[in-house]
Amino acid sequence: MAHKLIVVSMDALFAEDLAYLSQKPSFAYLLNRCAMVQKVKSIYPTLTYPCHASMATGCFPKKHGVVNNTHFVPGDASSHWIWYHDAYRVKDLHDACKEKGLTTASVGWPSTGKHPHIDYLVDEIAATKATTDEEFRHDYLLTGTPPELWDAVCAPHIHFRTQERSVFKFNAAACCEIIRRYAPDFVTLHVGEPDHSRHLYGISSEQILPALDLCEQCLTDILQAIRDSGHEESYNLVVTADHCQMDVTHTSCPNALFAANNLLTLDTDGKVTDWRAWSHSTGMSATVYVKDSTDAPVVYALLKKNLPQLGCSRIYTQEEAAAEGFSRNFSFVLETDGHTRFEDHWDQPPLTPIGRTKGSHGFHPEKGHRHPLLAIGPAFIEGTILPESHLTDGAPTWAKILGVSLPDADGHILEELLT
């Protein structure tokens, strides 16, 4: 029997959340029948887009190339999200599946825009200004959703975005529609709770319980869609996450330090016209770019001297960060003190008490909580429990189930879970 596989990423789901979710019917059903990894260690940085690239490729960021949620744009503190798949530098699971002639689908998975090897594609569109049906249709078609797929699976559920402002409900509904109608061989789904609620309320607030209830409803709907597809006997389902979060109390703006030390050139309106060093936030860490390598010792000394004033516990050199699997063309990485998140602004104080955000991530994966992995279906040994694994272990394991190859993967196959 050929295996089919659905991988659901519930963003920032903690292992500890299972105590609450185990009281819910669908999670109780899953927990009583699944193979499980109790605690999965994430990658550095513990940030959504790099994490999902690692989940899709089995590689660390220094190899797959996605090191942030947003593009590096010096002088611009706004977010330019990495929508498109061309950010990847290695083969992912969807590529591998198409090489074997399998059908593929993805809904809400970061950086899948215009992916050439996803048959049923609904990209994650973050920070869009769209508010109407037509504006959302434009954005989704722009990122690779075929018009006929929009009409069949997106349009019937777009009210979740236009009226309820719920990307979560839209993604879950569209994915279930795809499973019911087309029963693809490989499906990836990303839903943004409980991450969104933890950002707003902190990691342990009772206000995140409605987000966990949404996760229960999502699982209920997916299980029903699998039954409705007519392929219940061949489908495997994985429910997991990408990272966890920590509570934050302060915001750090290293670019303010650079501006005060003439490493940024500003015009009379305070806009950046040139830069020698630029800090790009990765949440509770930040990558520091140095335009001219001869300035690197000056920038390093300045940052080292001001680590406490920036809410940092340490600074990684390029070589040290690469040893953590986190490397691109930046020179340094600033790591949080465990209470501070970073922003790109240069016109604010270097360190201020937190305002809006109460929880965040992007920190080194040795910090904070871990997330679970629950797997059910004919490919998995019911009742098997592994105490831990690594985020990069998922993709090579899913590749083995699907009968495809990921030769670049850094992770290892979780043989103990498989039949």
Model segments located where?
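Short, structured active-site-proximal loop/turn typified by the sulfatase FGly-forming signature C/S-X-P-X-R
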Residues: 18-54, 58-62, 105
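A structural signal for short, well-ordered beta-strand segments and their strand-loop junctions
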Residues: 39, 103-108, 186-190, 239-240, ...
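Acidic/histidine-rich catalytic neighborhood
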Residues: 229, 234, 241-291
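Short catalytic/ligand-binding loop motif for oxyanion handling, primarily in non-cytosolic enzymes
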Residues: 15-17, 112-119, 195-199, 246-249, ...
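Metal-dependent active-site segment of extracytoplasmic phospho-/sulfohydrolases and closely related
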Residues: 6-7, 26, 214-258, 398
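Active-site neighborhoods of enzymes that stabilize oxyanions during catalysis
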Residues: 273-397
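Active-site metal-binding loops of divalent metal-dependent hydrolases
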Residues: 11-12, 241-244, 338
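His/Asp/Glu-rich, glycine-adjacent segments
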Residues: 60-202, 284, 299, 308
